[in-house]
A protein has these predicted regions:
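Sec-dependent N-terminal signal peptides
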Residues: 6-13
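Positively charged n-region of N-terminal signal peptides that target proteins for export
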Residues: 1-4
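C-terminal motif of bacterial Sec signal peptides marking the signal peptidase cleavage site
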Residues: 15-18
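First exposed extracellular module after export/assembly in secreted or surface-exposed proteins
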Residues: 28-172
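Bacterial signal peptide processing site
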Residues: 20-23
Length: 172
């Protein structure tokens, strides 16, 4: 009888030890952090007070956006000490002392994106805000975007494990 119980115990142990649920079915291995920079671009006129830039992800990264990716776009607003860029997350509003305002914002689909500057005045009178603009587009998994301070470009890059050498530079 002891031999039969031992046999059942060994067979049972082998049967249950081979069953596991670590197949990682819920892991999205296609989503990856990615960053690219659109340098020195002039936004195109839509109306006197609205200018934009349209592009496709396929053009920028040779692929469309995936379901679980979040798009973060930063605008270069300054350079400190000739080598330290200042990146501001958009959407962003720039207010002037006279009450005028410029809003930078973007929208996107899985295929394309549009970065827009819209003002309460004719933007041709403020070329510094529409010409020679530089933007950083960072694509990160949505769960990472939910857990990091998106306003801080450096924190986003650190959390995404991206460094400056991995940012693809694109000249329009």
């Amino acid at each position: 009888m002891k031999k039969i119980l031992t046999l059942f115990a060994v067979v049972g142990l082998m049967a249950f030890s081979s069953c596991s649920d670590d197949d990682n079915d819920n892991v999205d291995y296609d989503t990856f952090p990615y960053a690219f920079e659109i340098k020195n671009v002039d936004l195109g006129r839509v109306t006197d007070n609205e200018y934009n830039l349209k592009s496709t992800f396929n053009f920028e990264i040779n692929d469309n956006l995936r379901d679980d990716e979040t798009v973060l776009i930063y605008r270069l607003t300054d350079i400190v000490n000739s080598n330290t860029p200042v990146w501001q997350l958009i959407p962003r509003s720039v207010y002037f002392n006279n009450g005028d305002v410029i809003d930078y914002y973007f929208d996107f689909s899985k295929i394309d994106f549009i970065i827009t500057a819209r003002a309460s005045f004719n933007l041709i009178n403020a070329p510094d805000f529409i010409n020679d603009q530089t933007f950083r587009v960072v694509l990160v998994p949505s769960d990472l975007a939910a857990s990091v301070n998106k306003n801080n470009y450096l924190e986003v890059m650190k959390a995404a494990k991206l460094n400056e050498s991995q940012v693809q530079k694109i000249n329009f």
